[in-house]
């Protein structure tokens, strides 16, 4: 238990163009060295590419995130000199953060020329339940399933 008062969560302002809080969080994750305009250009460019193929790019992005969100993950826990990988459920906030992180990681490793193109293609693949980010989630779930026997070590 914390000794001091709990720090309140900061509210994220909705995105000016699409009115989405999720998109604002995504912009913040893409941003490096405080260059928000560059991060916005990347994400808006990706959403425009998605928009040329689909009706609602925000819906595609949210579907992609939903398909990448992990339900369970493993945490290391030492018990009597042995380290066990204990499966634990993921909090909703962490689910979203992990999904965004994995999508971004997968997009950065892709081969397309611009980051906007990489992001768009990774989101489109994730929305169709394929791609590197979805594979990462499947691997995480597989690890948790394999270590189900240690779930009684949960804390």
UniProtKB/Swiss-Prot annotation:
Keywords: Ribonucleoprotein, Ribosomal protein, RNA-binding, rRNA-binding, tRNA-binding. GO terms for molecular function: rRNA binding; structural constituent of ribosome; tRNA binding. GO terms for cellular component: small ribosomal subunit. PROSITE patterns: RIBOSOMAL_S7 (PS00052). InterPro entries: Ribosomal_uS7, Ribosomal_uS7_bac/org-type, Ribosomal_uS7_CS, Ribosomal_uS7_dom, Ribosomal_uS7_dom_sf. The keyword Ribonucleoprotein applies. The keyword Nucleotidyltransferase does not apply. Transmembrane segments: none annotated. One of its GO terms (biological process) is translation. Pfam families: Ribosomal_S7 (PF00177). One of the primary rRNA binding proteins, it binds directly to 16S rRNA where it nucleates assembly of the head domain of the 30S subunit. Is located at the subunit interface close to the decoding center, probably blocks exit of the E-site tRNA. Belongs to the universal ribosomal protein uS7 family. NCBIfam families: rpsG_bact. PANTHER family: RIBOSOMAL PROTEIN S7. Part of the 30S ribosomal subunit. Contacts proteins S9 and S11. This is Small ribosomal subunit protein uS7. It comes from Halorhodospira halophila (strain DSM 244 / SL1). The gene is rpsG.
């Amino acid at each position: 238990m914390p000794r001091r008062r709990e720090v309140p969560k900061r509210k994220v302002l909705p995105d000016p163009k699409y009115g989405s809080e999720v998109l604002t969080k995504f912009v913040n994750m893409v941003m490096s060295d405080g260059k928000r305009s560059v991060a916005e250009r990347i994400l808006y460019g990706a959403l425009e590419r998605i928009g040329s193929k689909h009706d609602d790019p925000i819906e595609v992005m949210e579907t992609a995130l939903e398909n990448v969100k992990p339900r369970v993950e493993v945490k290391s826990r030492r018990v009597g000199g042995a380290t066990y990988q204990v499966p634990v459920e993921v909090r909703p906030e962490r689910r979203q953060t992990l999904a965004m992180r994995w999508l971004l990681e997968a997009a950065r490793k892709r081969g397309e020329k611009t980051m906007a193109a990489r992001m768009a293609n990774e989101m489109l693949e994730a929305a169709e339940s394929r791609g590197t980010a979805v594979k990462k989630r499947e691997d995480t779930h597989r690890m948790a399933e394999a270590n189900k026997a240690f779930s009684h070590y949960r804390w």
